[in-house]
């Protein structure tokens, strides 16, 4: 093999290995952010006290107002339910049967949310 062809082949192999290593490092570091939220049925796999996002539908007749700015409710993915406790201002789209994402921690098998995000479908129309 000529020296020029051999050097080109070595350069291509080094570039390919560098790109593969870079992509591996990026995917490893983004592992927890690839999935935006977990459904309630996957929560038992998570250790308590770890910050995470859970999502599902607010179960009908589960909203319980504790104080002026504190509520508890249940979200479901039709497989498992999860109790959520939230203190703060509710999103405008928050209601029973609505999809939500809660950001917070799991403590004593109850999810303590510090932020709620209300989801809507592609046919969103603001409340009139």
Curated annotation (Swiss-Prot):
One of its GO terms (cellular component) is plasma membrane. Keywords: Cell inner membrane, Cell membrane, Cytochrome c-type biogenesis, Heme, Iron, Membrane, Metal-binding, Signal-anchor, Transmembrane, Transmembrane helix. InterPro entries: CcmE, CcmE-like_sf, NA-bd_OB-fold. The chain crosses the membrane at residues 9-29. It comes from the Bacteria. It is a single-pass type II membrane protein. GO terms for biological process: cytochrome complex assembly. It is found in: Cell inner membrane. Residues 30-128 are periplasmic. Pfam families: CcmE. Disulfide bonds: none annotated. Heme binds at residues 120, 124. Residues 1-8 are cytoplasmic. GO terms for molecular function: heme binding; metal ion binding. Heme chaperone required for the biogenesis of c-type cytochromes. Transiently binds heme delivered by CcmC and transfers the heme to apo-cytochromes in a process facilitated by CcmF and CcmH. Belongs to the CcmE/CycJ family. PANTHER family: CYTOCHROME C-TYPE BIOGENESIS PROTEIN CCME HOMOLOG, MITOCHONDRIAL. NCBIfam families: PRK13254.1-1 (NF009727). This is Cytochrome c-type biogenesis protein CcmE. The lineage of its organism: Bacteria, Pseudomonadati, Pseudomonadota, Alphaproteobacteria, Rickettsiales.
């Amino acid at each position: 093999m000529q020296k020029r062809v051999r050097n080109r082949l070595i350069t291509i192999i080094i570039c390919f290995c560098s790109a593969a290593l870079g992509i591996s490092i990026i995917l490893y570091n983004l592992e927890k952010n690839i999935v935006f939220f977990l459904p309630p049925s996957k929560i038992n796999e998570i250790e308590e006290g770890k910050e995470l996002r859970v999502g599902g539908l607010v179960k009908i007749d589960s909203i319980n107002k504790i104080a002026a700015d504190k509520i508890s409710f249940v979200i479901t993915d039709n497989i498992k339910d999860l109790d959520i406790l939230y203190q703060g201002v509710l999103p405008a789209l928050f209601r029973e049967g609505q999809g939500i994402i809660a950001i917070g921690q799991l403590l004593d098998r109850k999810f303590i949310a510090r932020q709620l995000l209300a989801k809507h479908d592609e046919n969103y129309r603001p409340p009139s």
